[in-house]
Structure formats: structure tokens, C-alpha cells
Amino acid sequence: MKNISVLIFFIMITSACSKQTDSLSKVNRKDFQTVVDGKNTDLFILKNKNGLEMTVTNYGARVVEFFVPDRNGKFEDIVLGHDNIEKYINFTGERFLGATIGRFGNRIADGKFTLDGVNYQLTINDAPNSLHGGEKGFDRVVWDTKQIDSHKLEFTYQSADGEQGYPGNLVVEMVYELTDDNEFIVTHHAVTDKRTVINLTHHSFFNLHGAGNGTVNDHVLMLNADKFTPVNEVLIPTGEQLSVEGTPMDFRTPTPIGNRVNDDYQQLKYGHGYDHNWILNRETSKGLELAATVYE
């Protein structure tokens, strides 16, 4: 068996906190209980000692709500989500709200790749490409879920050889943890029995004003990146690495997200806004380094 990857993502909430004991959730657990592909779906709650609270469903291992305090100590749900499981299953509009993405995040051109001389055809769900794992990616399966304690959930999913066209039996183990340092930590670990490709990620949509409270255009973003990867008209990277200097892609100095989103710039037209990868500046190849900051 091949140990593919161990990935850890951190989100630090730096705000004034006051301890809260009652649930902040605005959704009902029973509205998230159904059966999908013979497996039960449910809703889980994570909390830390500072009052941060997160609700999660095992359908797609999705974050449904995430309550954090603003600078004045007022708690708001800062992720976009639905109030029942049916809206996730029979989605209209955005499919990936709060979800785990796999086997492969982002687009694979024409849904094709070659590995060790073998050609693989994936399911097409973003014509002409395969996006975020295909027609039935990890966002549309029920994960086996174990509540470790009040602030930690453990998920497991076994993806069969050939699922959505990908080679290898793949076992994915994932942990969501809400720490007392106000970090949301996502840990991925995957093991395969065959050479394959994999790119796991998390897909929450954040709004620091609170879900439903306007846009993020006035959120001030800093990206520690001198370059980005331009895309073609179907959002496949061209292979180039372009400087952000003098373009709307330059967030090295903190800038409101919406300041230049409507600029006459071809990359923004292709993406209908920002839908790109930035190449992060790094001092070393290992360890954590500052990637980005955002505040309202």
C-alpha cells in the first residue's frame, strides 16, 4: 500500500471571545437525517472553550455552519450553507458548499490523464473537463463518521478502484478539529494500492460579515504571492507562471477583493472574477509560512 499524502490546513480566528454554553446552531438535526446509497446521514456539532461552534454533516463531510465572534464579540455564522440535507443532495446552483473535495480538486482537462503509460478517462461534470472529482466526487458520498470528543470529528471513506475513472482502491481518513486556540484544522491522510493521482481539499465559502449579509467585495485580502497561473477560456492552467505586478491579481498589499474584480482584464473575464491559483512565496520547502490574511 502506498501512503499518498498528509495535508493539514489551518484557519485562525483572531477575535474577542466570550464563553457560550448554549448551541448557536440555527438548523435542526432531524432535517439532516436521511439515507443516501444505503447509509445514514446525520449532523454533528463541534465546540471549543471560547464558544466557537461548527455544525457538520457526514454527507460530503460538509461544514454547514461555523459561528465565530467578530471584533465586538458578536457571533456570526461565517460560512455559506443550507438548512436541510435535501438542498445539498438535490442542489441548485453551487454544488460544493462546505464540502470535502476528492479525489482531485480543480479541473482536469477533458477528464483525461496518462499515468505509467495508461490512459484514464474520468467522468465529465464541467464540460469539457472533470471538476473536483467528477460527477460523484467525495462531496456526494456519505462518510463514516466518529465523534472523538466535543471538538474533534474523524471521517473515513473507501473509494473503489475505478470510481469516477480513477485508478486504485483509496482509503481516506480525515479529521476536523476545532482547537481552543481558535484554529479549524483539517487533516487528510490517504492510502492507495495502485499508482494514482490525488489532490484533496476543503471547499467552504466564507463571508466574515455572516452568511447572507452581503458580499465579500469589501473583505481586505493579502496574498503572499508574486506569481499566479493563468488559465484558458475553460479555466485550465496554461502552464505559464505570470507576475502579478501591475495586474488585478496583485494582492501582495492588502486590498479589498472587489476593488478590481470588474477591471478589463482577460483573466478576470475567463474566470468571471477570481478563479485562479496563486503561487505562494516560500522561504523554505517545509513548514508553515504565511500564505494569506483576510479581514472585514
Identify the residue ranges that each predicted region occupies:
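C-terminal motif of bacterial Sec signal peptides marking the signal peptidase cleavage site
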Residues: 14-16
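An exposed, glycine/acidic-rich loop-and-rim segment of catalytic or binding clefts
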Residues: 18-54, 58-296
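Sec-dependent signal peptide recognition
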Residues: 2-8
